[in-house]
Amino acid sequence: SSSTFLNTEVLRNQIESITIEKNNIVPSDAKYSKDISSKQDGSVMLWYTDKDNNNLYEVSIGGKNGSVEANTIGSGMFAYLENVDTLDLTGLDTSNTTDMSHMFRDSKKLTSLDLSNFNTFKVIYMNNMFYNCTSLTKLNLNSFDTSKVVYMNNMFYNCTSLSKLDLNSFTTSKVTTMLGMFNSCKKLSYIDLSGFNTSKVTNMQSMFYNCEKLENIDLSNFDSSNVTNMSYMFDRCSNLTSLDVSTFDTSKVTNMNAMFAYCNVLETIYVSNKWNTSNVTSFNNMFLNCTSLTGAVPFDSTKTDVSMANYTNGYLTYKASSN
């Protein structure tokens, strides 16, 4: 947070707003300006003002033709802006950006982000993109093209104020890791994952960990045939009453540690004959504190490991797979 912003003299924690301007003409009331163009030809200028005299700056970035082209590597570009509550990025051209990891990380005052103008066609990295954006309540990602994205781990980690997330436009056919993707999204009550293709995903560890307001998760289109790690996946989803994972093929999964732990109101877990735990080697506390769970037998606090992860004499309930 005390690092400088885009190699200028201004510190990230001294900024209160950022706007992409329509031109690169520096106004007379600017306290500071710098050429931040890659060619150092003045085509992209950054300047700041302090109109309310509070020692926090209003930063402007202006391009010659009204557009500012982001670098190929946009990692951390707007990260650690701990006093910024307004980001107007409508003039930012991201068409050549491949890395958006950590892009808004720890910008804890941001309440809304409209990224409807973002071109994400070339982006491969979206991991940690909104990590710890704890005040974010509105996030428009409808225009996102995620067809080339491989990394989505911790993408929305600890976005504790988000109550709904519509990701039905997401294409995830190349994504290999969703580790911690929605970890600790504690207010999330609605999530649309209907567009998700998870056929290449190998890691779903802590994917919905601590999503304590989620009452329902539709995972009917999930393909888990390449997943090896499902540990803590639904751990502390304390509002889930039923969970349908009947489409899950778990034949490659080796780690199911605490997969359903502390789901204390969860009554039913539906699985199909695709459910296979023969390769699971880590299974501690898999059903810890699942006190409401009943399958073939009711929950017994002395039996919380993978031996109960079946529908013949365990805690699971059979349902034919829909895919």
Question: What feature does the model see in each segment?
Answer:
Residues 1-323:
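Negatively charged
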